[in-house]
Amino acid sequence: MTQIAPITFATRFRGFLPVVIDVETGGFNSQTDALLEIAAVFLEMRSDGTLARGETTRYHVKPFPGANMEAASLAVNGIDPHHPLRPAILEEDALQRIFRQVRDAIRAADCTRAVLVGHNAFFDLNFLNAAVARAQVKRNPFHPFSSFDTATLGGVAFGQTVLMRATLAAGLEWDTASAHSAAYDAERTADLFCTVCNQFQGVFEASRRRLASMGPLEVEPSPTGEASPTREVSPSGEPSSSSDPSASGAPEP
């Protein structure tokens, strides 16, 4: 009988490390509207393979030159971009600081790249990618288009797609007064993601046993035409090789 490797981030998510990102912005257009706050929440894996929320990092961000800021958006998130006591830093500095932590976490978890976890993740990923392009950051540790969306997961698991409702449906706490802060929303998103993953733990373990019985599986080429850095998945679920997470080629989703 094939021995199945212990559950790690690398085996649980096929070599990718989920990192929760939430942004607060001056609108809905990632190309024209300001990025005002960004928070990252790192996850921890317990000895039994279940997930828990870990460290939170949050930065206030200075609007880029010429950035649009809609009054309606500022009313929702309660941010005064020009408040003299707001400890805001440049987009590039905020990204570099978070990315440094993400790269360290990727190496520690023996993963190949990070995948953004977000509630309506396309929104956060679009703003992240737009800020990366503006700041000309060369080493983005996040996959450019793959993500884990907790709006989708909440709908599947609990029948709720709104963050507050999905959080409450999952049996977690919600503080309306703290909502629309990047750090608070990212932490609730992390809790929701961990809860759903943990509830699907039995399904995941059954799938690992099923795949292990099939023998080694070849990984299909990525949409970019490049070979995936994991190349082949062993019967244990362990990637047979890994690559530098800062490499420019994106692995398949």
Located regions from the model:
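Acidic, Mg2+-coordinating catalytic module of metal-dependent nucleases/exonucleases
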Residues: V115-F122, N126-V132, T161-E220, E252
